[in-house]
Swiss-Prot record:
It comes from Arabidopsis thaliana. InterPro entries: Ribosomal_eS19, Ribosomal_eS19_CS, WH-like_DNA-bd_sf, WH_DNA-bd_sf. The gene is RPS19C. Pfam families: Ribosomal_S19e. GO terms for molecular function: mRNA binding; structural constituent of ribosome. The keyword Transferase does not apply. Keywords: Ribonucleoprotein, Ribosomal protein. Belongs to the eukaryotic ribosomal protein eS19 family. PROSITE patterns: RIBOSOMAL_S19E. GO terms for cellular component: cytosolic ribosome; cytosolic small ribosomal subunit; plant-type vacuole; plastid. It comes from the Eukaryota. This is Small ribosomal subunit protein eS19x. GO terms for biological process: translation.
Length: 143
């Protein structure tokens, strides 16, 4: 008997691509004016090349909240942080932009995909879980 597929059953890369396209098609996420000029962290030298980077980051963040839950802005700053190149000096870890993470979480919250957790951070809502699982089911059916 065939059962429904969840986000855990499909490739993360394929899911993020498909869910980012779904978010872009839905038109519920409104892009801020600064998306074409902002860097994603102080560790980066340039702004993202991909014009759809905001949707991809939102899809990735929704997937991470689905899988782990209880993630807040600080956790996403650590997750998307990386090594800052300091020229001739040794590299060091730097957190990513908190404003980008906060704005995406607020957008996902207005779309009713994530909600505030009483223990701190964000958790996935039932409608958000259903939405993510539907996209995962379409990916599994296509394979």
């Amino acid at each position: 008997m065939a059962t429904g597929k969840t986000v855990k059953d499909v490739s993360p890369h394929e899911f993020v691509k498909a869910y980012a396209a779904h978010l872009k098609r839905s038109g519920k996420i409104e892009l801020p004016l600064w998306t074409d000029i902002v860097k994603t962290g102080k560790l980066k030298e340039l702004a993202p090349y991909d014009p759809d980077w905001y949707y991809i980051r939102a899809a990735s963040m929704a997937r991470k909240v689905y899988l782990r839950g209880g993630l807040g802005v600080g956790a996403f700053r650590r997750i998307y942080g990386g090594s800052k190149r300091n020229g001739s000096r040794p590299p060091h870890f730097c957190k990513s932009s908190g404003g980008v993470a906060r704005h995406i979480l607020q957008q996902l919250q207005t779309m009713n995909i994530v909600d505030l957790d009483t223990k701190g951070g964000r958790k996935i809502t039932s409608s958000g879980q259903r939405d993510l699982d539907q996209v995962a089911g379409r990916i599994a059916a296509a394979v």
